[in-house]
Amino acid sequence: MVGVGGGDVEDVTPRPGGCQISGRGARGCNGIPGAAAWEAALPRRRPRRHPSVNPRSRAAGSPRTRGRRTKERPSGSRLGDHGRGRALPGGRVGGRGRGRAPERVGGRGRGRGTAAPRAAPAARGSRPGPAGTMAAGSITTLPALPEDGGSGAFPPGHFKDPKRLYCKNGGFFLRIHPDGRVDGVREKSDPHIKLQLQAEERGVVSIKGVCANRYLAMKEDGRLLASKCVTDECFFFERLESNNYNTYRSRKYTSWYVALKRTGQYKLGSKTGPGQKAILFLPMSAKS
């Protein structure tokens, strides 16, 4: 109420005795006549809801934040389609998995461990030959021949162990006879297939029959013969091919190769060439 002098006057309207006014209505007035009607006349306050509980505000959002992100994706979070996990920095990328492996990439797995590195392929070893142990891929690295070119006995310690040259074409071993003939034979017990390879220079070798005491030579007409003395026709370029077979090409007649036919006879040098099976040989140990 407002007083005559403009000052405020306290409201002294009588209320039922024993009533206490609270923020949500009168308490203790249920037993007083007329208290119910008086309480109904009081203004009621509706309880306020927290903004986070209001479903409309949660669905629609405020105009200021609608249509934009309020938080940036943390660094190292997972990238990809419907992923739910957040991997550590350097985490996996792509897929729908929920794994948290820090290093795994791709896939849909849910593993939590780092993938084990794939084992390196085993080194290619020597393949066993049909007639014994094979020195596949070996290149002769031997000292040079004596300057006098003598055909005497080999000085001890100057040569590697004797070899057998196994031809891929027909499965023959290169054989040098004491009378100078050259051919192939399948029996590995034949003593004339035991050969001594000696390096004259890098990549160049001579081939000598241990029992025949003769050197393999390529003649000008392409024939293979065994010479008692070392000449310029007795040296061959030794090359390791990609299939682990060796080829022996004449140093004097550079387009001709040592070769054996499927019948076991030697092949004329003029009829040989790269890629033929007849020119492929495997050096095998003669001790077995």
Curated annotation (Swiss-Prot):
Bias class Low complexity marks the residues at 113-132
Residues spanned by motif Cell attachment site: 179-181, 221-223
Pfam families assigned: FGF
Keyword rRNA-binding in annotation:
no
Which SMART domains does this entry report, sorted A to Z?
A: FGF
Record keywords = Angiogenesis, Developmental protein, Differentiation, Growth factor, Heparin-binding, Isopeptide bond, Methylation, Mitogen, Nucleus, Phosphoprotein, Secreted, Ubl conjugation
Regarding how it is modified after translation, the entry says: Phosphorylation at Tyr-215 regulates FGF2 unconventional secretion.
Could you tell me which cysteines form disulfide bridges? none
Q: Where is this site: Important for interaction with integrin?
A: 261-262, 267
**Sequence similarity:** Belongs to the heparin-binding growth factors family.
Q: What does this protein do?
A: Acts as a ligand for FGFR1, FGFR2, FGFR3 and FGFR4. Also acts as an integrin ligand which is required for FGF2 signaling. Binds to integrin ITGAV:ITGB3. Plays an important role in the regulation of cell survival, cell division, cell differentiation and cell migration. Functions as a potent mitogen in vitro. Can induce angiogenesis. Mediates phosphorylation of ERK1/2 and thereby promotes retinal lens fiber differentiation.
Record's subunit section: Monomer. Homodimer. Interacts with FGFR1, FGFR2, FGFR3 and FGFR4. Affinity between fibroblast growth factors (FGFs) and their receptors is increased by heparan sulfate glycosaminoglycans that function as coreceptors. Interacts with CSPG4, FGFBP1 and TEC. Found in a complex with FGFBP1, FGF1 and FGF2. Interacts with FGFBP3. Interacts with integrin ITGAV:ITGB3; the interaction is required for FGF2 signaling. Interacts with SNORC (via the extracellular domain). Interacts with glypican GPC3.
> What name goes with this protein?
Fibroblast growth factor 2
Q: Which organism is it from?
A: Pan troglodytes
Gene name, per UniProt, is: FGF2
